[in-house]
Amino acid sequence: HYAAQVPEDFRFIVKAPREVTDPYARDDRGRPTGTNPLFLNAHAAVDNFFGPARLGLGRKAGPLVFQFSPVPHPELRTLEARIKLFERITTFLAELRAPGDGLLLAAEFRNYELFTPRMMKRLRTLGVSPVIGLHPAMPGIRRQTEALRCWAGDFRESEAELSGESDVFVPKASGSSI
């Protein structure tokens, strides 16, 4: 048992299986073979990920990370398609939360289309931390830093941002509040 092998204050970061974070079923080489029927399925995430992680690690379970595989950019060309994916992902994350569950959830997006003010604000509302990282499929570090600052409440809201029509992060003026 891993939990017994580490200091009491140690916490494991556990990554969710791609069965719930990848829109495609894949072959042994990682090539898409079709649509993944368990993509964004909260019941599968609880049964195959949360339960085993909590049972095996107990109090030593740290952040549970959902690395969302890239969706092909052509599939996200329209505002309607981006909003639909946004709603599916945030509904999935909301379904994973239970009041007072104490779980630390984090989300990593491999599509720049999901690094929007609307997504960061919804993650904050859900108590889900964004993951920042260096990967060819992820936006540049500047965009990720802006997203993290937005998640922390450092950017102002506008109707365009909240509707999903804008993906521009606009810093708040000094002394203003959300």
State where each predicted segment sits.
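Residues lining hydrophobic/aromatic ligand-binding pockets adjacent to catalytic sites
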Residues: 1-178
